[in-house]
From Swiss-Prot:
Residues 78-269 form the ABC transmembrane type-1 domain. The chain crosses the membrane at residues 14-34, 86-106, 112-132, 146-168, 201-221, 248-268. PANTHER family: ABC TRANSPORTER PERMEASE PROTEIN MG189-RELATED-RELATED (PTHR43744), SN-GLYCEROL-3-PHOSPHATE TRANSPORT SYSTEM PERMEASE PROTEIN UGPE (PTHR43744:SF8). Belongs to the binding-protein-dependent transport system permease family. Keywords: Cell inner membrane, Cell membrane, Membrane, Transmembrane, Transmembrane helix, Transport. The gene is ugpE. It comes from Brucella suis biovar 1 (strain 1330). This is sn-glycerol-3-phosphate transport system permease protein UgpE.
Amino acid sequence: MIEQRPVSNLIGHLILILGIIIVAFPIYYTFVASLMTSTQIIRPPISLLPGDHLVENYREAIFGGVERVVGVSLERLLWNSFVVAMAIAVGKIIISFMSAFAIVFFRFPMRMFFFWMIFITLMLPVEVRILPTYKVIVDLGMIDTYAGLTLPLMASATATFLFRQFFLTIPGELVEAARIDNAGPFRFMRDILLPLSKTNIAALFVILSIYGWTQYLWPLLVTNDAKMNTIIIGLRRMVDWADASTSWNYVMVTAILAIIPPILVVVLMQRWFVKGLVETEK
């Protein structure tokens, strides 16, 4: 039986509440500010009570306000972010799944060397890789394209490692039984590995889709055309260095709309996400 200690429980709950406040307050203030005019937002002291411009601000931002500021519609920014997030998440999962499958279940020369070469890339900072990657994208003419935005970000050493570790837990008897039943490698992968890996795939999809949605540095480098901007780049370009000339109400509305999709992904896939992180199905 776990001993109940009221003081420890109280301290633990206070720490949790403090953490929630620290995380939630910026989101709350962003929402509150999205209901105010730009003048009200920059006028001190900061109001923590919601304004009365909900319909006006959101209607204007969605139907032309953002486009007047950054030269591209809010819908286009959200669509670009959606395409980038889905392409990166799905691409990373497919490539990592296939790579781990080959490393674990195929016997070929230097397979562990190739695995460690993939794994070592985790030790390389983004800044080290980004310049040669950018040079390749420029030479291939992929600036201002979805391919340029997504292809360089599809390889994932982390996902490959996680899939490899999971595949190593597959009983050898299961592999041997599939071989006796004349199941080829791709049938084994499709009929056995994919069903067993569904919770791991779901957990990785949540993490990787949010990773793709929140990309800033790479889209900033490879997009010159405003029509290829993601929502994060659009937000940055909406903010002028002079506060008085920034439409802060549109900025706050855009920020709220930008965080809704990741929240929906986490909420809708929460059960699969937790299950994929803490359980192993076999």
